[in-house]
Amino acid sequence: MLRTKTPRPRGGKSRRATAAAGKEREREREREREGRSPSGELSLQLEHVSLFSFLADAPREGAAAARTPFTPFEELLEGSCDPDPTPPPPLPPLQPQATPMDADEVVEEKDSGILSQDFFCTPDYITPDAPQLGSGFDANKENIPCPNSPEKSVCRSKRYKRDCSPKGLGSNDIFDSQWIAPVQFEGLDDSEEEQLKESSSHKRGSYVSQSAVALRCRVMPPPCIRNPYLNTDHQIDDNVFGGRQCKSSGFSPSVDGDGLSRYRTDFHEIEQIGRGNFSVVFKVLKRIDGCLYAVKRSIRQLHNDRERRQAVKEVQALAALGCHENIVGYFTSWFENKQLFIQMELCDRCLSMDRNQPLKCGEALELLYQICKGLDFIHERGIAHLDVKPDNIYVRNGVYKLGDFGCATLIDRSLAIEDGDSRYMPPEMLNDKYEHLDKVDIFSLGAAIYELIRGTQLPDSGPQFTSLREGKIALLPGCPMQFQSLIKSMMDPDPVRRPSAKEVLRHPIFDKLHKAPAKK
């Protein structure tokens, strides 16, 4: 084909056309440098841009000026143009041929008209990463393979319940790590507590089975305390006690899960009914059974081991003795805030309240008989009270009961001995002679009855105090001589000559008092 040169237009319009054509050529060069082919975009450009408008103005402007050589793109356009000066009709828009295409090609053809997120450097959240359906998907349900039945496993696995999962954890967090409830390290030594905390902190990031948690973080129970008032050592294995000392960590505070104390939870405090040097007694109502009890609480906190052992002695003695009609009943005890609480039988009053009112001889005989039965009961079990006095003798429904076993010890002197009230102590106790501890209780009971009959408090020192230890006892007004001689024998300075509790019960003075009615 012969190439015809188009005359270059003159004037302002020709310069503007030349400038527009130059800009077009610059854009074509940039596309070529960027790797774009002009032939690929030719069909789209011809739909919107017509170059014949530039060629139509050329004959009306005059002779053509000297022009630059043709570019390959211009040569292509010149070759495709017809030499006829009449412009051809505009080309119709190109229609894509209906050729069979795959599904992937259809998707690419549709996406060609949509601006890609990659062009704007933004992530695509709409298009899925993986195909939703496999290429071999078949709508026929008969071709779907049936999965195999699960194999039976011998070991059982624990299933987690949704309602049991702790708040704040997702559904997948249960399988990543086991939630462990906070553990209270009560009953543990300081070294054991630190050891458990370190081991739990190392294992917190990994899964811990429930059995391992129970074994590792289990709160150790308090130690078993050997009761020295019981002769059952041959029936209990020594490994139960383990030789562990009675430490503060051994007595875990009796506090519920919600932080309430056992005393406030189980009992309603009514009033205070007694107070001593070491403890205070309250009249309480137990909430669960509606019965009245007496709760004895230590006044100050028991910090060291010696104080705790001394406080526990009363509990151990009461528990070892068991039930007797002339001994104050014992129910239970516990430690709370380093204080000892003892739940006991509630009595009407103690004899110290009647100290200002002299006791009649008949009442004194009944008192002597009943308390001697209680002393005989504890002496047969090898226990001495060592603190018999009116403050520790109680009355309930006309029955006299002996209480407060805080100074109780063993008659064989295998335990430490602590003196009671010095006003009722015999001379051998003041001289540290402990060969006849059971006779100490006999002297104290005689001195207590002597005080109650006279209606005056015994001295703790002075000439009268010495005279009583020497056996010089004044006459008791309104009492028979047989009764006065019995009281004098009970307060004999020599413990060997004093009668035992069993011998006092056999005294003839009680024959008339407790004589059985004759059978008809």
UniProtKB/Swiss-Prot annotation:
First and last residue of the signal peptide: none
Top enzyme category: transferase
Biased composition range(s): Basic residues: 1-16
EC number(s) given by UniProt: 2.7.10.2
Ranges of residues in domain Protein kinase: 267-510
Transmembrane regions: none
UniProt-annotated binding residues for ATP: I273, G274, R275, G276, N277, F278, S279, V280, V281, K296
Record: residues binding Mg(2+): N392, D404
Biased composition (Basic and acidic residues): 22-36
Pro residues bias locations: 84-95
Keyword Magnesium included in the entry's annotation: yes
Catalytic activity: L-tyrosyl-[protein] + ATP = O-phospho-L-tyrosyl-[protein] + ADP + H(+)
SMART domains: S_TKc
PROSITE patterns: PROTEIN_KINASE_ATP, PROTEIN_KINASE_DOM, PROTEIN_KINASE_ST
Positions annotated as active site in the UniProt record: D387 (proton acceptor)
Segments for region (Disordered): 1-43, 61-103
ATP-binding among keywords: yes
GO MF entries: ATP binding; metal ion binding; non-membrane spanning protein tyrosine kinase activity; protein tyrosine kinase activity
Record key words, sorted: ATP-binding, Kinase, Magnesium, Metal-binding, Nucleotide-binding, Phosphoprotein, Transferase, Tyrosine-protein kinase
Gene3D superfamilies documented for this protein: Phosphorylase Kinase, domain 1, Transferase(Phosphotransferase) domain 1
GO cellular component: cytoplasm; nucleus
Alphabetical GO biological process terms: negative regulation of cell cycle G2/M phase transition
Family: Belongs to the protein kinase superfamily. Ser/Thr protein kinase family. WEE1 subfamily.
Name of the protein described by the UniProt record: Wee1-like protein kinase
Organism (species): Oryza sativa subsp. japonica
Gene name tied to this protein: WEE1
